Amino acid sequence: MADKFHILLLNGPNLNLLGTREPDKYGHTTLADITADLSALAGSLGAEFSHFQSNAEHALIDRIHQARGNTDFIVINPAAFTHTSVALRDALLAVNIPFIEIHLSNVHAREPFRHHSYLSDIAIGVICGLGADGYHFALQTAVKRLSTSN
């Protein structure tokens, strides 16, 4: 790895519509706003940051595979794939990169089918219900964990 830690942010389906999609649940902040804020935060923490969003499960899996060997930590909002994707789980296990699962809304206060996650039991942690701030907490936690483990 390089001298700087590399953090990868992955966002799943429909998150490209943030800011306009159900703002009562997801807020008015756009994905572009979130990634710009995180890029600046990562820079201030001395970390490298990249991000990828896709509505396609296979594209997210491919990006996870590409992360092996050049990414130190993943922050992932799998969105609806949280509740359905064994394939994302298997990809994350295969690359063995620590990750935090994040959700803008409190999935436990929503429909029962949203209460189950195929990722949470293998994640370092799960952040939900804190809106865009949750992404900041996840990034800060990732850098702190990497800094104390090296």
Swiss-Prot record:
HAMAP family: AroQ
Superkingdom of source: Bacteria
EC number: 4.2.1.10
Gene: aroQ
Taxonomic source organism: Sodalis glossinidius (strain morsitans)
Chain positions recorded as substrate binding sites: 77, 83, 90, 104-105, 114
Enzyme class at the top of the EC tree: lyase
Function: Catalyzes a trans-dehydration via an enolate intermediate.
GO molecular function: 3-dehydroquinate dehydratase activity
Family note: Belongs to the type-II 3-dehydroquinase family.
Site feature: Transition state stabilizer: 21
Pathway(s) it belongs to: Metabolic intermediate biosynthesis; chorismate biosynthesis; chorismate from D-erythrose 4-phosphate and phosphoenolpyruvate: step 3/7
GO biological process: amino acid biosynthetic process; aromatic amino acid family biosynthetic process; chorismate biosynthetic process; quinate catabolic process
Designated name of the protein: 3-dehydroquinate dehydratase
Alphabetical UniProt keywords: Amino-acid biosynthesis, Aromatic amino acid biosynthesis, Lyase
Active-site positions on this chain: 26, 103
Gene3D superfamilies registered for this protein in UniProt: Dehydroquinase, class II (3.40.50.9100)
Quaternary state and interactors: Homododecamer.
Catalytic activity line of the entry: 3-dehydroquinate = 3-dehydroshikimate + H2O
